[in-house]
Amino acid sequence: MIDIFLFVHITISILLIIVILMQRSGSGGISGISGDNNMGVVSAKTVGNFLSKSTIILTTLFLINAIVLANLSAKKQSDLVSKINEIEENQADNSLPIAK
């Protein structure tokens, strides 16, 4: 289960990096690579709005996924600690000498 969320987390991270780099900044960013200032049917404002909304959505998904991963990891660690304690108790009980 954690593997699935980890894969989703990595995918969201990569998409978030791409979307952030595509946004126009003071120096133009990666969006200026195409060389076309004339966007044709899609205006620069529309692309900017789409990238802004995409960034917000991906950031929200990233944070939610990070919280879920943290909770799953904490639960898995607590289960592991309880199993270790149980094994230690069983070994301690088995190693005690029996008085006759």
From Swiss-Prot:
Coiled coil: none annotated. It is a multi-pass membrane protein. Pfam families: SecG. It comes from the Bacteria. It is found in: Cell membrane. One of its GO terms (biological process) is protein transport by the Sec complex. GO terms for cellular component: plasma membrane. Its main location: membrane. The chain crosses the membrane at residues 1-21, 54-74. One of its GO terms (molecular function) is protein-transporting ATPase activity. Belongs to the SecG family. Involved in protein export. Participates in an early event of protein translocation. This is Protein-export membrane protein SecG. The gene is secG.
